[in-house]
C-alpha cells in the first residue's frame, strides 16, 4: 500500500536569482562593522532529504524572540514552474512562530540593530545644534506612520549633509548604498581570511532591496 504524502506549505517571497549580494552584506555587517555581530549566519547548505538547498540568517531580537531569513535554491526542478529561488521570513519565540512581510522584518531588525535618533535630538535641533545621532535604517520607518519629530529630524539630517553644486543627491545615494558596494568588494577578502581594520558603520537599505524581492 502506497504511503500518503504529507505536504507542508509555507509562504515564500520570490527573488530573481542567487543571493550572493545578501550573503556578502550580512558578512560585511557582522565581521567588519560589527553592526550584526550577534547575528548567526549559516552558509548555503544541503537540507537532509530535500532536493533544495538553503542558507539561514538568524537575528536575535528583544524579548528572547528571533527573526530568521532563509534563502532557498532549486525549489522547482521541473521547468516551467515558479522561480527556483525564494526567501522565507519568520519571527518566532519559544512557543510561537509566524511568517512576516519584508516591511515587518525591517521594523523588527531596526528594533534591535542599527542606530536611530536619540531622545535628545529634538531639543538639539530646536536649539540649532548639530545632531549627535542619525538613523542608519530609514527603510524600517517606511511602513510606519512617522511622527512629526522624526520627519523634522530627517529634514535636519538631510540639510546637514554637504551640498556640492547639485551632487548632494548623488552623494546621498552613494552613502546609502555604501554597505552593498563594500560588501561586493569585501567578500573575496573575507574568504582569504585577511585581517583589516574595522570599517565605518553603513546604512542598511532594507530587506526587500537587498534580496531584490519580487513578490
Curated annotation (Swiss-Prot):
Chain location of the short sequence motif HCCH motif per the record: 110-141
Motif (BC-box-like motif): 147-156
Keywords: AIDS, Host cell membrane, Host cytoplasm, Host membrane, Host-virus interaction, Membrane, Phosphoprotein, Ubl conjugation, Ubl conjugation pathway, Virion
Residue(s) carrying Phosphothreonine: 98
PTM-bearing positions, type Phosphoserine: 147
Gene Ontology terms describing biological process: viral life cycle
Pfam families membership: Vif (PF00559)
Compartments in which it is found: Host cytoplasm; Host cell membrane; Virion
InterPro entries: Vif
Family: Belongs to the primate lentivirus group Vif protein family.
Comment block on domains: The BC-like-box motif mediates the interaction with elongin BC complex. The HCCH motif (H-x(5)-C-x(18)-C-x(5)-H) mediates the interaction with CUL5.
Note: Required for replication in 'nonpermissive' cells, including primary T-cells, macrophages and certain T-cell lines, but is dispensable for replication in 'permissive' cell lines, such as 293T cells. In nonpermissive cells, Vif-defective viruses can produce virions, but they fail to complete reverse transcription and cannot successfully infect new cells. Vif-defective viruses show catastrophic failure in reverse transcription due to APOBEC-induced mutations that initiate a DNA base repair pathway and compromise the structural integrity of the ssDNA. In the absence of Vif, the virion is morphologically abnormal.
Protein name (database record): Virion infectivity factor
Organism classification: Viruses, Riboviria, Pararnavirae, Artverviricota, Revtraviricetes
Amino acid at each position: 500500500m502506497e504511503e500518503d504524502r504529507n505536504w507542508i506549505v509555507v509562504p515564500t517571497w520570490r527573488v530573481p536569482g542567487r543571493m550572493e549580494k545578501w550573503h556578502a552584506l550580512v558578512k560585511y555587517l557582522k565581521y567588519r562593522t560589527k553592526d550584526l555581530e550577534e547575528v548567526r549566519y549559516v552558509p548555503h547548505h544541503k537540507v537532509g532529504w530535500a532536493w533544495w538547498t538553503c542558507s539561514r540568517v538568524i537575528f536575535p531580537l528583544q524579548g528572547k524572540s528571533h527573526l530568521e531569513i532563509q534563502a532557498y535554491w532549486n525549489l522547482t526542478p521541473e521547468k516551467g514552474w515558479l522561480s527556483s529561488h525564494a526567501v522565507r521570513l519568520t519571527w518566532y519565540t519559544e512557543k510561537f512562530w509566524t511568517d512576516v512581510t519584508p516591511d515587518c522584518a525591517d521594523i523588527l531588525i531596526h528594533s534591535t540593530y542599527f542606530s536611530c535618533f536619540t531622545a535628545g535630538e529634538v531639543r538639539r535641533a530646536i536649539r540649532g545644534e548639530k545632531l549627535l545621532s542619525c538613523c542608519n535604517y530609514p527603510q524600517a520607518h517606511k511602513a510606519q506612520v512617522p511622527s512629526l519629530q522624526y520627519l523634522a529630524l530627517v529634514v535636519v539630517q538631510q540639510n546637514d549633509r554637504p551640498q556640492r553644486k547639485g551632487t548632494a543627491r548623488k552623494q546621498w545615494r552613494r552613502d546609502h548604498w555604501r554597505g552593498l558596494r563594500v560588501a561586493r568588494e569585501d567578500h573575496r577578502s573575507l574568504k582569504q581570511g585577511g585581517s583589516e581594520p574595522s570599517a565605518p558603520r553603513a546604512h542598511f537599505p532594507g530587506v526587500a532591496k537587498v534580496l531584490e524581492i519580487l513578490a
